[in-house]
């Protein structure tokens, strides 16, 4: 394994000797960081199931503001510390269960990596816990790596998911929906109203039009008719 880009590009990293620990390959790591490359510099990063620390160290190399490595395995913690030798940056290595870490603090993170052992059943639990604990910053992304054979099926409607399949490995980029409320009487609905909504949809994942009724003004259209036009 090596660091793909940034200050420490090309630096070799030690791989785990434990077959149960499955480090992200350089090819997959490069693809992932091509997708999130504009989100890393200055980001606060939480690397859950950190293993060798390769993902978090890649973030340090690319200018992340802070990286917190979390793994409950003593051997993984030792490996992360070994790979961090010679790496300068603002980082912490935490030997603990991911749920305890998510529930105990209040710091928010721009990027949260979730890369548990395949078929452990911990991945979706960690994604949901990261969302429910409010540890994901506004506009932040959860990067969830898992087996292609076990696809991530979202059970909530407040997130958007971008999926990248790479053979036996799939990576989902999960973030909260960006929503907006556009309130007005819309009586009548104008081309200007439609243009504003169209522009908002370029920025937000979901736009809600709130139709108001002015009791002091005679309506041209009923609220139901305005809703149908919109």
Regions found by a protein language model. Give the residues of each.
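Class I S-adenosyl-L-methionine-dependent methyltransferase catalytic core
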Residues: 1-177
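Nucleotidyltransferase catalytic core that binds NTPs
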Residues: 178-230
């Amino acid at each position: 394994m090596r660091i793909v880009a940034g200050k420490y590009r090309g630096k070799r990293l030690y791989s785990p000797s434990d077959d149960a620990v499955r480090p992200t390959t350089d090819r997959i790591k490069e693809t992932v960081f091509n997708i999130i490359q504009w989100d890393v510099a200055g980001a606060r990063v939480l690397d859950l199931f950190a293993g060798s620390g390769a993902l978090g160290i890649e973030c340090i190399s690319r200018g992340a503001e802070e990286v917190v490595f979390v793994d409950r395995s003593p051997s993984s913690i030792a490996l992360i510390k070994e790979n961090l030798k010679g790496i300068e940056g603002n980082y912490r290595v935490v030997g603990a269960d991911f749920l305890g870490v998510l529930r105990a603090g209040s710091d928010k993170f721009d990027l949260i990596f979730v890369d548990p052992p395949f078929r452990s059943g911990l991945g979706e639990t960690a994604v949901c816990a990261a969302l429910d604990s409010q540890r994901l910053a506004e506009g932040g992304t959860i990067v969830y790596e898992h087996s292609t054979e076990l696809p991530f099926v979202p059970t909530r409607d407040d997130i958007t998911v971008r999926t990248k399949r790479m053979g036996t490995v799939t990576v989902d980029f999960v973030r909260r929906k960006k929503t907006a409320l556009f309130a007005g009487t819309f009586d009548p609905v104008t081309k200007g109203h439609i243009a504003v909504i169209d522009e908002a949809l370029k920025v937000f994942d979901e736009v809600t039009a709130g139709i108001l009724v002015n009791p002091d003004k005679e309506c041209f259209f009923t609220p139901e008719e305005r809703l149908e036009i919109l």
